[in-house]
Design a protein with these regions (language model features):
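The feature captures the beta-strand-to-loop junction immediately N-terminal to the Walker
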Residues: 37-39
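Helix-to-loop junction immediately C-terminal to a conserved catalytic motif
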Residues: 52
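Conserved ABC ATPase "signature" region
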Residues: 102-119, 172
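Hydrophobic anchor residue at the start of the ABC signature
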Residues: 138
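Conserved catalytic motifs of ABC-family nucleotide-binding domains
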Residues: 145
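Catalytic Walker B motif of ABC-type/P-loop ATPase nucleotide-binding domains
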Residues: 149-153
Length: 252
C-alpha cells in the first residue's frame, strides 16, 4: 500500500479557550482529490493551514511525505496590489532555479489553464473581478508544481456557470500534473463535481462526522447522479442519515 501524502493522527487545535478541532484522523492518499465539508467554524480552514505548515496541532501528529511540496490558496487571494496578474504568478516562482523568462512563460501558461489570457494578464488586482482574482491566486498555487494543493473555498467568488467550468478545468490540471488536492467547500454539488472522496466534519469542535468515497469519476457522473450524491452529503451533514464513520478516514 502506498503511504499517504498527508496524515492527521488524532489532531486537536484551539484558538485561545475555544476548541476548534478534536480527534481528527485523516489519511490523504496520493493522486486523489479530497473535499472537506462542514458548518462554519468547524475547523476546515484550520486543517488547511496545518497542512500548509502555518499552524501546529495542539495535540496529535501531522505527517507529510518526505519532500512533499505544498501550495495553499486561501479564501482571500492575497495578491500583491502593485503587480499585474502575470507578475503576481511569476513572482511566486522566484524561488525556483529557472531563468526569469521561463518564470514568466510558466506563469502565462498556468494562467491560461485557469481561463485568463490576453489583456487580462496585464490587469492589476483592483482591476479584476473577485472571480478573476481567485483564478490568479489558483494559478499562483498551481505554478509551483506542488505535490499537494491546498485550496480553501477556491470557487466561492465565481458565478455558478464559471464555477462549474472551473471544477472540470482544475481537476484536469491536477490530474495532468499528478498532484493531490485537499479542498474546502461548503457546497455539496461542488464536492461531487470535483472530488474522489468527501470528509464531513461536525460543528465545532470539528470531529469526523462521516466519510464518503464517491463512485466513478466526476466527469462520468450524470446530472441526476450529481443531484442524488449531493442530497446524500447534505443529509449526512444535517444529521438526517445514520452515520457509520470509518475508524480512520482514508484507511481501508
Amino acid at each position: 500500500m502506498t503511504a499517504p501524502i498527508l496524515s492527521f493522527d488524532n489532531v486537536a487545535f484551539r484558538y485561545g479557550d475555544m476548541p476548534v478541532l478534536d480527534g481528527i484522523s485523516i489519511d490523504i492518499p496520493r493522486g486523489a482529490i479530497t473535499c472537506l465539508m462542514g458548518p462554519s467554524g468547524c475547523g476546515k480552514s484550520t486543517l488547511i493551514a496545518m497542512a500548509a505548515g502555518l499552524l501546529t496541532p495542539e495535540s496529535g501528529v501531522l505527517r507529510r511525505a518526505d519532500g512533499c511540496r505544498t501550495a495553499p490558496m486561501f479564501q482571500d487571494p492575497l495578491l500583491l496590489p502593485w503587480r499585474d496578474a502575470l507578475s503576481n504568478v511569476a513572482f511566486g516562482l522566484k524561488a525556483e532555479p529557472i531563468p526569469a523568462a521561463e518564470r514568466v512563460e510558466r506563469a502565462r501558461t498556468v494562467l491560461e489553464e485557469t481561463g485568463l489570457s490576453g489583456a487580462e494578464l496585464a490587469k492589476f488586482p483592483h482591476q479584476l473581478s473577485g472571480g478573476m482574482r481567485q483564478r490568479v491566486a489558483l494559478a499562483r498555487a498551481l505554478a509551483v508544481a506542488p505535490d499537494l494543493l491546498l485550496l480553501d473555498e477556491p470557487f466561492r467568488a465565481l458565478d455558478p456557470p464559471l464555477a462549474r467550468r472551473m471544477h472540470a478545468r482544475v481537476r484536469r490540471v491536477i490530474e495532468e500534473r499528478h498532484a493531490t488536492a485537499l479542498i474546502v467547500t461548503h457546497d455539496a454539488r461542488e464536492a461531487v463535481r470535483i472530488a474522489d472522496r468527501v470528509v464531513l466534519l461536525s460543528a465545532a469542535p470539528g470531529r469526523i462526522r462521516a466519510f464518503r468515497e464517491l463512485p466513478d469519476r466526476p466527469e462520468t457522473r450524470t446530472a441526476a447522479e450529481i443531484a442524488e450524491l449531493a442530497e446524500e452529503l447534505d443529509a449526512l451533514a444535517d444529521g438526517e442519515l445514520p452515520v457509520r464513520p470509518h475508524p480512520r478516514v482514508g484507511q481501508k
